[in-house]
Amino acid sequence: MSFKDLRSFISHLEANGELKRISHPVDPHLEMTEIADRVLRAKGPALLFENPVGNEMPVLANLFGTPKRVAMALGKEDPLALREVGELLAFLKEPEPPRGFKDAISKIPMFKQALNMPPKTVRNAPCQEVIKTGSDVDLTKLPIQHCWPGDVAPLVTWGLTITKGPRQKRQNLGIYRQQLLDKDKLIMRWLDHRGGALDFKDFKEKFPGERYPVVVALGADPVTILGAVTPVPDSMSEYAFAGLLRGERTDVCKAISCDLEVPATSEIILEGYIDPEEMAEEGPYGDHTGYYNETDKFPVFTVTHITHRKDAIYHSTYTGRPPDEPAMLGVALNEIFVPILRKQYPEIIDFYLPPEGCSYRMAVISIRKEYPGHAKRVMMGAWSFLRQFMYTKFIIIVDEDVNCRDWNDVIWAITTRMDPKRDTVMIENTPIDYLDFASPVAGLGSKMGMDATNKWEGETDREWGTPIVMDEAVKQRIDTIWDDLGIDDAPTL
């Protein structure tokens, strides 16, 4: 099942018991965060606050609060099925020519999907049913959440920021938090390596001093939203990838004030520009690390037009100590990363980003070890292969007999198969998340790799231990007589 807009997905979730309407008045100032946080930690439903205090516009929260709902947004019922998306991405990153007629036939489904890539331009788009300009532009009339007590101001969290660089054929979609600064101004917090910031940098170099057109879409269809957080090849538009996932082209329309294309079924569109000379101090805000971050200067986004659907819905979230919504997205996207990594490194058995590691700061990888030093090759490859792992501080490599998603297994491997000096790799002066205050310099810090695999000849002079494993025939014999032993339920092994 595919969803052309956010409303159809809301209806689908509600019909399947995955969305709860809240009619009781709830304040966007702190109260929504507390409710959404409790519900998410209980693995509860998405929430539609129908009566936000001080506003008539409903607020949608906790939309992707479980990996299951992320899968549902992409037409899947099980998060493991998201590996199909990863296989598609792996193919797009490095398409292989058919090895023969049968192989060509097997690739036809992927080629058919590729035909759905170009977005479809439409007129009379739902997102432009209501148009506000001039003095009618007032961001304070949106029910923007103020998430945490120490936050400096309300924060736009789920906006899809749409940009285009002068050297790029495709548009870029990215999700960057935006601090409410004034009735018509937001602070655009994008880091230097992100797509929007790179487009802006190229524009400033080619057109110094000129205003840079920017559009922000709120409440886009779920597939387009997820396309913006997926490791799409640099040469491909997120709109095109969303069309691939949906199985039909993404509807877009031209913005009113510039040539950028916006998701046609979005709930709200903010149009405007960034003046390269206008910067403002952003923060502090509570973030996905579980801490308030430092303040810094970022560009100011001036909003000149607001368009929206009739009876628009405001899509919002909060970020905090895991688990939060970004952490749940990370759990689901984990399944997409596995086939992409395996394409480059077939020896990888599994890959895990533990949500308590703030989604990406730690990775555990199990491999089919084939030679001495193999673990170090894989950890170096993981750090460099995808931009998403640029900020991963810790990588642990284990053997295929270790479940990399089970901390009991992983800790056992670390404590029995590692020598701290020999098997630890330290790399200094590497890119680190700006929000990581533990690093000695903002944006620059170290990384640690841990080789928790069995050591081969050449890696150790010692006789290596043999794991204790019970005789399989004995295990089967005990299984057959267990009920006769009068012992309570057998532990799950």
Swiss-Prot record:
Task of the protein: Catalyzes the decarboxylation of 3-octaprenyl-4-hydroxy benzoate to 2-octaprenylphenol, an intermediate step in ubiquinone biosynthesis.
Cofactor annotation: prenylated FMN; Mn(2+)
HAMAP family in alphabetical order: UbiD
Example of a GO biological process term: ubiquinone biosynthetic process
Key word Metal-binding present: yes
UniProt xrefs under PANTHER family: 3-OCTAPRENYL-4-HYDROXYBENZOATE CARBOXY-LYASE-RELATED (PTHR30108), FERULIC ACID DECARBOXYLASE 1 (PTHR30108:SF17)
UniProt KW keywords: Cell membrane, Decarboxylase, Flavoprotein, FMN, Lyase, Manganese, Membrane, Metal-binding, Ubiquinone biosynthesis
Domain of life: Bacteria
Species the sequence originates in: Shewanella sediminis (strain HAW-EB3)
Name of the featured protein: 3-octaprenyl-4-hydroxybenzoate carboxy-lyase
